[in-house]
Amino acid sequence: MNSAESVPALTRRTFISQAALGAAAVALAPQVRAAELPPPKLGIAILGLGGYASGQLAPALKLTQNVQITGVITGTPEKGRNWSQVFGFPEKAIYSYDTMARIADNPTIDLVYVVTPNALHREHVIAAAKAGKHVITEKPMGISVAECDAMIAACRAAKVKLSVGYRLHFDPYFAEVARLAKEKDVGPFQKLSGGFGFTLSQPQWRAEKKLAGGGPLMDLGIYSIQAAGIATGEAVPVAITAKEQPKKRPEFFKDVEETIEWMMEYADGTRADFITSYNGGINRFRGESDKGWVQIEPAFSYNGLQGDSSKGKISFEPAVNQQARQLDHIAQCVREGRESDVPGEMGRRDMIIVEAIYTSAAQGGKRIEIKV
């Protein structure tokens, strides 16, 4: 049999059918290739180029998969130009606080990360929301519950997502704390303890109430509140008792606390005892039950965390970048139109706790019941 006899006749119908299939395959090819490619990164503008933005967010943004920096908002033009050169966005995407409303006209900016002093968060979050941009605000969310309410309302009105820069939720050591709390042979924890503190040696805005809203509780104590939330499945305490310790440097901490300790009671009987200070080093979290325990020390640093538990040592290698994971998670949630794991409502909850701590301390350690 010759080769011609082995080839079936090509009728007009089969030709058209095969041609159509071929055309469909050609048309489908770009779609297949597109499906294989990762989605484009969302653009973020950093608002406030201080130490945290430069020292932590800038390195993190070189590691992110879902978001890239496409602009900055700063009161120092030279800082903006430096960021432009490092990250490759045009100088026209450098905005001042007075001109930031113009970000509404920049389609390359999807999110704004507010990294200014605490008392400025409300103003800047609302401005970003009015520009139609999703917002991340650094912790604490604000300096009062009322400010948190205003930010949440503004973002809802603008139909944008609001998240808080709570990095502990993106560290594997605290993911392990959450996991162990649910394990029957370790958790649930009935006693939580620890704290975060260091010596604040140089005058700065963190020791000024008008900018910080408070002292170490606002800056560092918020981490212990977050850790307690992680260890209790985000339970809210029912009551708080607090005491401010006598100041060793009253001339330095004129209108904010230097050291404060507090106890949180939960509906199930769990008790949490924490301390925070600008005059001494502590960096620890511990959870205990009658069956087991977990301890992270250091607990609240950007890296170098170490853990131990009744079930053995806790170690994660290689180390992760908390901020990069946080940014990628929030960007992915924005892309999918869902709330992040660290929404504005969580920041509001924590500010309710902070206000109760300050109220108790101001009233000589009175037990303050919490209503959310």
What do the predicted segments below correspond to?
Residues 93-154:
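Beta-loop-alpha module in the N-terminal Rossmann-like domain of NAD(P)-dependent dehydrogenases
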Residues 16-38, 111, 315, 332-372:
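C-terminal helix-rich "cap/oligomerization" subdomain common to oxidoreductases
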Residues 2-23:
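N-terminal secretory signal peptides and thylakoid transit peptides that target proteins
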Residues 46, 96, 137, 162-164, ...:
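Hydrophobic residues in well-ordered beta-strands that form the structural core
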Residues 150-167, 190-192:
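Rossmann-fold dehydrogenase core element
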Residues 226-303, 324-339, 355-357:
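Contiguous beta-strand/loop segments that form the cofactor/metal-binding neighborhood of enzyme cores
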Residues 40, 52, 168-254, 364:
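Predominantly a Rossmann-like dinucleotide-binding segment in NAD(P)-dependent oxidoreductases
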Residues 18-88:
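N-terminal Rossmann-like dinucleotide-binding module
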